[in-house]
Each structure stands twice: as C-alpha cells, then as structure tokens.
A protein has these predicted regions:
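Conserved polymerase palm-domain catalytic core
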Residues: 3-10, 60-154, 158-163
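Active-site-proximal segment of RNA-dependent polymerases
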Residues: 8, 16-70
Length: 163
C-alpha cells in the first residue's frame, strides 16, 4: 500500500494563486537546502531577490533607460516538476538530490499532474532561480549585450535599454 507524505500544514489562495504553508520539517529542510545551494551556485548579479530591498534596487537600475519590457512567467513555480529540481540539485553537487526534491515539492494544484515547486516554501525561490538561471532563458539573458539592463526578481524579468 502506498504511503502518503505531507510536507505542509495547509494551503490557501491569495489572488487566485495557491500558497502552501510548510510544516516544521519542511521549514528546517528549506533552511538546510538554501544553505547548500548558496554554497554551491553563484547567481548572476541580475538576480535580485536574494538581497535586501532588492525589488526596489532592481527597478532603479532601469530608470535611466528609454525602453522597458517586463515579462511575468505565469505559474512559474508550479511549472517546475520534481525531476527537474532533482536534476539541477544533482548538477551542482547537492548530496541526496532525490530526497531534497521530494520534500521540496507538492502535488500539482493545476491540471498536468505530478509534483511541483510550490509558492510558500522557504527553498522555492532559490530552487526556481537555479532552474531559471540554467534554462535557455537564463542563457539568453547572460548573452544579452551590456547595453541592455536586465533584472530578475522571482518570476518577473525586466529588460531595458536606450534604443
């Protein structure tokens, strides 16, 4: 008989989006995983949500430019499946990537099934950023010319330039 596991106390909707409240085990695991990823992966300077007051700092970088573009990735966290989390943790050398991926994901609240990264867990932002950074989007952002100002805050990408 399959055994169920719970890594959250409950969930609620905020602006129509499911938010998960981690239990004590998940809070502790999130703290450990945050440390492990931070020690093993260096984020590009245009990833702003790991700094104090970062959303304001990120936007100020764009103020002197003439043209502006903002991209919001819909359901970004909930599009990141457990296997992807495991694969990226393994790639940066985090021990027991299957374990951390299992306990960092929840059953997908949207159609599509599987287990996904939830909003509300302590480790979700750094895991989502790791995956975005190593995705074709992250590679594209790194390849943009220096004349383009770029910033990433959670699932929002801002680009700006003078021409």
């Amino acid at each position: 008989m399959p055994i169920t596991f719970e890594n959250f106390k409950g969930s609620y909707l905020k602006k129509g989006k499911p938010i998960y409240v981690p239990n004590d085990f998940s809070l502790d695991l999130g703290k450990k995983l945050l440390r492990k990823v931070s020690r093993r992966y260096k984020f590009d300077p245009f990833f702003y949500h790991f700094k104090d007051g970062s959303h304001v700092v990120a936007l100020h970088k764009h103020r002197e430019n003439k043209f502006f573009c903002r991209v919001d990735i819909q359901r970004f966290f909930y599009s990141i499946k457990r296997n992807r989390v495991k694969r990226h943790l393994k790639a940066i050398g985090v021990p027991k990537p299957e374990y951390y991926a299992k306990w960092s994901t929840v059953r997908n609240p949207y159609p599509g099934g599987g287990y996904v990264l939830p909003y509300g867990f302590r480790q979700s932002p750094i895991l989502a950023s790791l995956i975005l950074s190593e995705s074709p989007v992250g590679i594209y952002l790194r390849g943009l010319p220096a004349t383009i100002t770029k910033s990433v805050f959670m699932d929002d990408i801002c680009l700006s330039g003078m021409d």
